[in-house]
Amino acid sequence: MIPFFKKKIYLTRAIEDNLNFQKYFNLLQPNLEAKEIFVSVPLLNICFDNIENLFIPENNLIFTSRHGIKAFSESRYLNLKKIFCVGKSTAEIAIQFGFKNVCFPDEGNVKSLIKLISKEKKNLQTFHYLRGEKVSFNLRKALSDLGYKTNETVIYKQESNN
């Protein structure tokens, strides 16, 4: 227990995130035991859709989360696509899963991603946004408003743990 805390702290992210948080906490605070301080209680499960037969003709793919990367990682066409990731950590996961042509903005947010994409030649580029069912920003609309043809496919769902 943290000396000034009398109760445990609940971590509500996905199990993988909670375990990583506890691992990094132990690195920063080696004298404290994360398992004694934190309780992992995920509120959501990530459920990947079956995309085995999904064919995406576009050469430019957009990912705004590591879950999208993981869901699409079984694709046979990884080396043939240019991958736009929302930030460095998503890009690193893409590279770990075998994507070769990966780019990401300096700042890991959707507005910076849009700026990066907007450097591409508009009239020659078509994009495909692979995403979760629930998103906080309509990236397809934002890119369409800038003149980009953007298709999207939901490849995972965030389901409640009720």
Regions found by a protein language model. Give the residues of each.
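Signature of uroporphyrinogen-III synthase
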Residues: 1-162
